[in-house]
Amino acid sequence: MPEEYLNAQKMEKLERIKSRGINPYPATFHPSHTSVQAVALLAELEKQENPPKEILRIAGRIMTLRDMGKISFMDIRDGSGKIQVFCRQNDLDEASIELLKDLDLGDFIGAEGSLMRTRTGEPSLAATKISLLSKSLLPLPEKWHGLQDVEKRYRQRYLDLISNADARQTFLTRSQVISAIRSFMSSKGFLEVETPVLQPEAGGALARPFITHHQALDCDFYMRIALELHLKRLIVGGFDRVYEIGRIFRNEGVSTRHNPEFTMMESYQAYADYKDVMDFLEEMVSSVVKEISGGYTVPFGDTTLDFTPPWPRLSMRDAVKQYAGIDFFDFPTKEALAAEMIRRKLKVDPAKDWGKLVDELVGEFVEPRLIQPTFLTDHPVAMSPLAKQKPEDPRLTERFEAICANMEIANAFSELNDPVEQRARFKEQLEKRNQLRTEESESIDEDFLAALAYGMPPTGGLGVGIDRLVMLLTNHDSIREVILFPALKDREDKGEQE
């Protein structure tokens, strides 16, 4: 950041502070209490007839500053909340009195003193000493309106978090959701593991990968597009229940529901099928919702989402019949289904295969009808190269997606563990993908097929979109609101402060 963007008045104050021999950026300060702890302690002391006069040390950022001559009031905020600091010149040492003159909104201070309640009933710390912990050199966003520019909120998330209590609460909730999922998975006997982000093959999903080059090894790697294939290797290796919460990278479109890097939780359970996983997901999500919100219902936009189990279950074929009026098995080829869609005046991308066209029908007609949590089950084989076929109808797979508020929040299979069938499906999938692309062709993950050939037990696999789940629990309709630093197009004026 060029120095000319720094606030001149704040720079003058900084120099005055330095001239008095004060380090404006000391290495440490040890608070005795957080602001919330201090307020709670005051309430406890007020219950006692003769409470002891305790000396506390608190620290935080100055959010409001009111100078009334010989008395000043400051609201300071730390990670737990805020508390008022009451400064009376008669109670302060000379250095603190001088320092007060050069403090601004945004500065971090440490305050030492005793607890009190003002005449208006405000819990406060009556300060006897003030220490500067960090001098702010740029003005904070205007107090009453906060940070209004949406892109600036995403680009400079630190300002958003300073200004907007709702933003801070969103990311506190996100952390609580992930902690609740980890606790639930542990209670069910799942082992949390870590698998490679850099991979020699881009497998486990139909998505375009990011590619990077490893200088020392002199070879290209892909940023992972799924957690799946390495987790299945661990099932082969003898772990019965494994899961990972990790970042996924897909070099595809950006929207209110898609970010190039996002967080997934994937789990794999030996000796389970997709119906077992359906029950498992239902229990997990409903328990997380209850832990976070206190009940099974949460507001979302103009509606209320109800996660009370059991959730409705609807086959994909029946759903497309019901909402689009098309039985996709009546049109078994790409050409036939495309012709029917064109006849109904629907847009058709000629590059998409039959499975992708079915997916288009689901996105166009089915997902917009599914507001409450619903399981969409039994996808066609063409859409599910890693899932087992249904014995009673081999055109379909043992798969489900959990849909809520018109978007997919989870996806699960009875995992395909026949290495011969898996190779055949990989080949078919690869041929389709390479026909559609002009860049370097992809290849089959031979090591994964080798792992399957050693034997993998019947396994139920699950993937949960953490970002979308957090969207639902924080009442946000954009994924950028729940990712601390979402992907944004580079701006031409980078480095400038508005």
Swiss-Prot record:
Where Mg(2+) 1 binds, per the record, is at 401, 408
Task: Determine the domain of life of the protein's source.
Answer: Bacteria
Among the entry's GO cellular component annotations, what is one? cytosol
Name what cofactor the protein needs: Mg(2+)
Q: Which UniProt keywords apply?
A: Aminoacyl-tRNA synthetase, ATP-binding, Cytoplasm, Ligase, Magnesium, Metal-binding, Nucleotide-binding, Protein biosynthesis
| Disulfide bridge positions per record | none
Gene Ontology MF, one: tRNA binding
- What does the record give as the reaction this protein catalyses? tRNA(Lys) + L-lysine + ATP = L-lysyl-tRNA(Lys) + AMP + diphosphate
BP terms from Gene Ontology: lysyl-tRNA aminoacylation
Q: Which residues bind Mg(2+) 2?
A: 408
Enzyme Commission (EC) number: 6.1.1.6
Query: For this protein, what does the record note about how its cofactor is bound?
Result: Binds 3 Mg(2+) ions per subunit.
First-level EC class:
ligase
Location in the cell: Cytoplasm
Q: Which family does it belong to?
A: Belongs to the class-II aminoacyl-tRNA synthetase family.
Which HAMAP family does the record cross-reference, listed alphabetically? Answer: Lys_tRNA_synth_class2
Q: How does it assemble?
A: Homodimer.
Could you tell me what this protein is called?
Answer: Lysine--tRNA ligase
Organism, as annotated: Dehalococcoides mccartyi (strain ATCC BAA-2266 / KCTC 15142 / 195)
